[in-house]
């Protein structure tokens, strides 16, 4: 599956999911020979997917592993090296774990965060699609 297809699927899922509620940029300390000019945005999207996966599950969205599945598609499309796959997964886990430390129950701020991340993730995916046609 091409990057554009994977990003389109992520964008559609982020836009169509029922909303409830800024992300840190992934670290770029590693030298990856497969690095792409859009990596900062891609790793940010990965982190958002992890955050959304955790928060929506916490708030009872009953989506199972949908967001993890979207991440698997992204890794399958963009994980062209072991280092790159590890960085993508690390970004997803960073989003998941970061919000797992902050939110233990579904609260109004958690719902607001979901809304923000759904919007931010959809915009980011759309931007990645547009810039990489």
Annotate each language-model stretch with its function.
Residues 1-6:
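Bacterial N-terminal signal peptides that target proteins for export
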């Amino acid at each position: 599956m091409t990057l554009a297809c994977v990003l389109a699927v992520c964008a559609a899922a982020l836009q169509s999911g029922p909303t409830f509620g800024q992300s840190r940029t992934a670290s770029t300390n590693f030298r990856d020979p497969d690095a792409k000019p859009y990596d900062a945005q891609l790793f940010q999207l990965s982190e958002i997917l992890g955050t959304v996966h955790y928060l929506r599950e916490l708030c009872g969205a009953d989506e199972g592993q949908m967001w993890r599945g979207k991440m698997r598609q992204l890794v399958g499309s963009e994980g062209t090296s072991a280092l790159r796959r590890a960085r993508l997964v690390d970004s997803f886990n960073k989003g998941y774990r970061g919000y797992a430390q902050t939110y233990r129950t579904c609260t109004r701020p958690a719902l607001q965060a979901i809304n923000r991340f759904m919007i931010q993730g959809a915009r980011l995916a759309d931007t990645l699609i547009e810039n990489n046609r």
